[in-house]
Amino acid sequence: MLVFRGWERPLYFAPHHQRDDPPEKLPKPSFGRPEFFEYIEDEYLVCREAVGLIDMSSFSKFLIKGEEAIPYMQKLCCNNVDVPKGYVTSSMMLNESGTYENDCLVMKRNEKSLMMVCPTQQQTRIMEWMENHLEGFKSVSLQDVTSMYTILTLVSEMWFSSF
């Protein structure tokens, strides 16, 4: 178990570990295959060949609201976020030089509201960066809602084969 920005996040699930056992020590860093590689490989194969459930609750979450919410996010994201209601867009956010600021998922809630999910470590930095780019968007409000929402993600290659 790893604690990251106050969130407990498992690195892997060891099949031999029992609920009442003391926590395992973090493995030694390695440039080769770590000792827990087989556990992660098994988890990967389940997600690829069947269905996996990933808890993304620790990821940063923001609400972007207002009449100009979509134009504002269109300016910051390099992918089109003006999609039908309920759709999720994967995008990067780039600065004025065209270099990377953030990787995010943007869900259109309605014409005046979007939710953005990005890496845990971006929570403080990206909020400040977005606030610094509000000029000209008077109706846009930003709200950090990380602690208000849980995100569970179903992962499966089988899902894509149905299209």
Language-model regions, residue ranges each:
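Glycine/proline-enriched, intrinsically flexible loops and inter-domain linkers
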Residues: 1-163
